[in-house]
Amino acid sequence: MENFADSTKVAWQTDDGKTTFCVPIASVIHGFIYNTAIFDELKLTPPTTVAEFHAVLDKIKADGKYTALDIGTADQWESATMGFQNIGPTYWQGEDGRKALIAGTAKFTDAPYIDTWKELASWAPYMGDGYQAQKYPDSQNLFTLGKAAIYPAGSWDIPTFEKQADLKFAAFPPPVVKAGDQCYISDQLDHGIGLNPKSPNLDAAKTFLTWVASPSFAAVYANALPGFFPLSNAKIDVKDPVAKQFLSWRQTCKATIRNSYQILNRGTPNLENELWGVSAQVMNGALAPDAAGKQLQADLDKWYHPAK
């Protein structure tokens, strides 16, 4: 376990951090995937600021041939996962903001969260016709067919798109609000493996987990499943070009995990599920950003006392 930084163990630890019960394996990173052929055709460059992002979206929309922003709200979870949790860390400053929510010193009614929903609401004019009925597979198909320019993504989408030989794509990280601002990424702890202490195969399982924790496993895993990134501190040569782009953001951006996962997902109403519905409603124009913050904070206050 010496191959893993403390931050990579959080998803598989007791709250006091004293007991780790899984070997961390991999994370997924959020960002935006774009069709490079469309960008070349329209003479666009990947945006680095929110203003540049909207300028690019305006140009794609004005051209009229492609859906500018390929995301739907029918399934709801995409609105939270590839929307709110993708761009939000830029506004609430990653781990600082996430930990402040847990401590109760920040609320969903604060400006960083309202500003995140305001930005999500501004996406609507760039999304496809009927996006309210568009499901996750619909979004994937639209991008795969070359009919959409920008796809709010998780790195787990890379293998799906790479099955299409004719599709050329790349990625850019969530744009910052102002040029020169610190960039943030959601580098979500995704999976680990634990050992049942009552297993009849303890020795064999320990041998396997020792390998799972090794640099050699990390190297195999990173290239066998592009878009799922090893959590060990081993230096890995990721060969997939788009996965390599996503991974490179760890060097320039500060990483965080989704703010609805650690501790705050334990009560009722469930914060993760509430975020789905609230974010989808904001993107549908059915809920104002201020109202979204009030609703989410009120739901959290029903069971999470530090938030009061």
Question: Model-flagged regions — what are they?
Answer:
Residues P24, L101, S186, F229-L231, ...:
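C-terminal capping/gating helix-and-loop segments adjacent to ligand/active sites or protein-protein/ligand interfaces
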Residues M1-H30, H54, F84, A170-F172:
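Hinge/lid segment of periplasmic solute-binding proteins
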Residues M1-F4, P89-D115, K163-Q164, V176-Y184, ...:
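Short, solvent-exposed loop/beta-turn-alpha elements that line the ligand-binding surface or hinge
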Residues N86, K118-N201:
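Extracytoplasmic/periplasmic substrate-binding proteins
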Residues I38-F39, A55-D63, P137-Y151, G277, ...:
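Short helices/loops that flank or line small-molecule/ion binding pockets
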Residues L57-K59, D63, I102-Q132:
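Glycine-centered hinge/linker elements that transmit conformational signals in sensory
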Residues M1-S7, A37-T48, L142, A149-I150, ...:
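Extracytoplasmic "Venus flytrap"/periplasmic binding protein-like
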Residues L145, W156-T160, P174, H191-P269, ...:
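Mature extracytoplasmic/periplasmic domains
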